[in-house]
């Protein structure tokens, strides 16, 4: 009788334990489900935010060396055009705000980026023997500087940022067979001094200063805020965003070709030049369209 009674008590205790554990388990399951759903919602929100940011300010792409197709073109950017104005203003520093030339000039002056010679053929070379010394740049283009204790100093009003109203850029349009996508990447930039214009209609003469390797300066350009346009005065983009998103408006003046010719070498009139530029632009667009059939 005592054994039966003991067995009955143990059985009842076991049943009570199971019954009491069920709500806790259900609460735990419900809590985990809510947490998982919340995590998914947060992940979705984060992903949406990431996608939106990627659309507005895409991450700089690295161009593979083994692309299936590539066309290199050189463009001239006229900073008096509205599309290119963010590169020019402010002409003189306002507080911490500076324009692109002042920024890269200071980087070159302090040895943070290298400047490379602009050769007569206009083709960039980023070899070690093509690097320019800072004094060479300053002396060649009559930029006033002072030297003290081995350090070169240039006052803000001696930086010729107002005269740099043009840039040459090299861009590569390429097909990446691994991703099946077309992309356009700026690979080199050259600031151009425009000097010699007069009040009698004389045109300014371009003086290309030096080439900059875009991959070398890109990390610095990502720290230079600028206004996207005249209609939005918020500094909501960087110089790197500007070039990565191809926000500039530039006319083709040269392509990579076997003869090394610029368009001016075989286009004798302005109309012939415009026609050739249009042909090259269409050639690039047609290739992309033909690839996708």
Protein language model regions, located:
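Surface-exposed flexible segments
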Residues: 201-218
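Residue-level detector of short, conserved catalytic/binding motifs and their immediate flanks
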Residues: 165-167, 171, 185-191, 210
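Extended serine/threonine-enriched, polar tracts that run as long, contiguous segments within proteins
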Residues: 181, 186-206
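Residues embedded in well-ordered secondary-structure elements
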Residues: 10, 158, 178-180, 201
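Bacterial Sec-dependent N-terminal signal peptides
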Residues: 1-29
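A domain-level signal for the mature, folded cores of soluble proteins
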Residues: 23-178, 196, 216-293
